[in-house]
């Protein structure tokens, strides 16, 4: 059987379908024929409405969770509604101001992500997530500090004033002179570069015997590079807010689904893969239920949009995660506005990139 399109529906079937979807999104409960008969746009008897509802169910657009409980949209029905019927409502001036409020010059990227995700979760009644790839800073100095005979602390100082510490395990004791030699060598090679830019050069010099380092210092440098490069490829900076919004009255009727969703939200790396799909998009993307593998078990939806810097390059993703009955018409433009606002504020002068 060929999947139906909106053009396959009669005007009355289309109107009843719209009312069922909008009623379900608003209440979280199936919509029955008596409720539909009360709408002025439906001039049909309850019996005639039930007949149309059955047709929509047979077409795969609606489902009946219980015999007398009314109808609710299927994932396929929601997709048809979102793509062909939904009319978006732009954020109000108050909503735009709430999103912009926490994004102030002189803040940090982390504070901006937290502010944006908090505002978006409050406005959307879902869980909001904002992601930006971890930025690799340019370095100005590297030094090694002894902690114990078999451990050393590597201290990295970046151009923006940031300081990062990493503990390195040593196979055998290393003296102060070897620590100093390794630090001086790395500082001379990495100064003004990112670790990724210089790591290959350093490794090639050591492998080719061109580093002028003794064996202990060369081993220390190699171990430091392993620790730092592993960290540099770690998961991106991500902020999730509003998980409690998922625990509303209707959601608690299906506590197993909520438990599954909250468990899925703990997988930052998995969420990052979901949001990466939106990075390639030119506009906001909507994943409904099983359209996205990560959230297919909990039957949840994701609305995500890439955000860009002043040069138009995609630098992050912002999104809302929630039940399939998200208010798409309201949340889609809200996510889009948040993405635009993040790009504008984080690209402005005076915004710290630490």
Swiss-Prot record:
**A Pfam family for this UniProt protein?**
HrcA
Source species: Novosphingobium aromaticivorans (strain ATCC 700278 / DSM 12444 / CCUG 56034 / CIP 105152 / NBRC 16084 / F199)
Name listed for the protein in its UniProt record: Heat-inducible transcription repressor HrcA
Keyword Transcription included in the entry's annotation? yes
Q: Which UniProt keywords apply?
A: Repressor, Stress response, Transcription, Transcription regulation
Does Repressor appear among the keywords? Answer: yes
NCBIfam families registered for this protein in UniProt: hrcA
Similarity comment text for this entry: Belongs to the HrcA family.
Function of the protein: Negative regulator of class I heat shock genes (grpE-dnaK-dnaJ and groELS operons). Prevents heat-shock induction of these operons.
Per the UniProt entry, what are the Gene Ontology biological process annotations, in alphabetical order?
negative regulation of DNA-templated transcription
Q: Record's HAMAP family?
A: HrcA (MF_00081)
